[in-house]
């Protein structure tokens, strides 16, 4: 969904100070040279993007410098190398937010255009051009991106934590089931 204003109107109305916008023009091109992904995430957050701290963004992925505050990236999202998140169009300069749902994966070289929402657990193929919303639990690929199929993977398998491990192991609980390292360590501490 594109906003009804163009980029120039948005620049005048945005809630960010002009000094911060100027600093961000210097910082954003340098983020790709930061070797630590958590620091890169913090820098993107400082520039205005709404990124969950568990999201991983590759070095060469780029967020739009014009309006990074319109980008929202959910928990556990993986954004591969060369991905471009563009919040404004060049033809008529309309702006639009980009929302990427939790546990989604964006393949290398994909381009996400303004006004796109990517659902939870979605997978975007490499070099895809996403110009429409992507529903949850699907795979998309191509130019323009089209739905290939459902991911078909139970959500519990994608995001295993100590909290949901016990319920997942449930009925097939045996000595052969390997526990996550944190769960095994916690069990050792309890027995001591």
Functional labels for PLM-detected ranges:
Residues 66-68:
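Right-handed parallel beta-helix/beta-solenoid
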Residues 70, 92:
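A short, polar/charged loop-to-alpha-helix boundary motif
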Residues 47, 53, 58-59, 64, ...:
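Left-handed beta-helix
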Residues 94-107, 111-112, 143-192:
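C-terminal segments of enzyme domains that contribute to small-molecule binding surfaces
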Residues 89-90, 116, 150-151:
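Conserved catalytic-core motifs of eukaryotic protein kinase domains, centered on the activation segment
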Residues 1-53:
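A transmembrane-helix-recognition feature enriched in membrane-embedded lipid enzymes
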């Amino acid at each position: 969904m594109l906003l009804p204003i163009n980029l120039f109107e948005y620049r005048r109305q945005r809630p960010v100070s002009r000094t911060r916008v100027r600093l961000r023009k210097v910082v954003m091109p340098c983020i790709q040279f930061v070797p630590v992904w958590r620091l890169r995430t913090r820098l993107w957050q400082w520039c205005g993007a709404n990124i969950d701290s568990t999201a991983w963004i590759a070095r060469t992925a780029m967020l739009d410098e014009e309006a990074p505050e319109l980008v929202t990236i959910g928990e556990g999202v993986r954004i591969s190398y060369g991905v471009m998140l563009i919040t404004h169009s060049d033809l008529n300069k309309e702006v639009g937010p980009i929302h990427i749902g939790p546990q989604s994966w964006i393949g290398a070289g994909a381009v996400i255009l303004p006004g796109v929402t990517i659902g939870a657990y979605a997978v975007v193929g490499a070099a895809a051009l996403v110009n429409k919303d992507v529903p949850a639990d699907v795979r998309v690929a191509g130019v323009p991106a089209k739905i290939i199929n459902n991911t078909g993977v139970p959500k519990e398998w994608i995001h295993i934590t100590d909290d949901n491990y016990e319920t997942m192991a449930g009925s097939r609980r045996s000595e052969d089931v390997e526990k996550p390292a944190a769960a095994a360590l916690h069990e050792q501490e309890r027995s001591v």
